A protein has these predicted regions:
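Transmembrane beta-barrel architecture of outer membranes
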Residues: 4-12, 23-25, 46-52, 105-109, ...
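Extracellular/periplasmic loop regions
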Residues: 25-116, 120-123
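A C-terminal functional module that forms or caps the active site or interfaces directly
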Residues: 120-157
């Protein structure tokens, strides 16, 4: 049981569809979150939303995917919180967004992945921006990720 004053409710949907030459995967998530900070007369309530939508196509062993995620903001004062998340897996690998900025976070990601020489490769590009640019913050940068995973003498090797 956590005592973090967060109430989060959401829905998620994923699907797959196969064509003659292309396999499709798609999905979406939506959540709403309320947070209460402080107590008594000094208590402040914040509300933020979360949205994620993706579409992926696999053809000839290569998967191309576009993913759009919004960790919303409450007027630049509070960003949608994910205190129980697997943090390094999402929003890029440089760990710049382990905590959602108060302005929120929009992550537009394009990725390609496939197999090569007995291993798996992944190339991903992230474009980050603020959900609420009311504090003069809008462009939060971009990131390029490249990964190759293979087995060497029964041990996994990731570069």
């Amino acid at each position: 049981d956590t005592d973090n004053a967060l109430d989060t409710y959401g829905v998620s949907y994923d699907g797959k569809m196969k064509g003659d030459n292309v396999s499709w995967a798609y999905g979406g998530e939506f959540a709403t979150q309320s947070s209460e900070v402080g107590a008594g007369e000094t208590a402040t309530d914040f509300d933020a939303s979360y949205l994620n939508a993706y579409l992926a196509a696999t053809f000839s062993g290569i998967t191309a995917k576009v993913d759009y995620e919004i960790l919303g903001s409450d007027d630049g004062m509070y960003g949608f919180a994910t205190p129980l998340a697997t943090l390094h897996k999402f929003n890029g690998w440089t760990d710049q967004f382990l905590g959602t900025p108060a302005q929120g976070l929009k992550d537009l990601k394009f990725s390609l992945s496939g197999g090569l020489a007995g291993g798996k490769w992944l190339l991903a590009y992230h474009d980050f921006s603020a959900d609420d640019s009311s504090n003069g913050v809008d462009d939060l940068g971009s990131e390029l990720n490249l990964q190759y995973v293979t087995t060497v003498q029964n041990e996994h090797l990731t570069t």
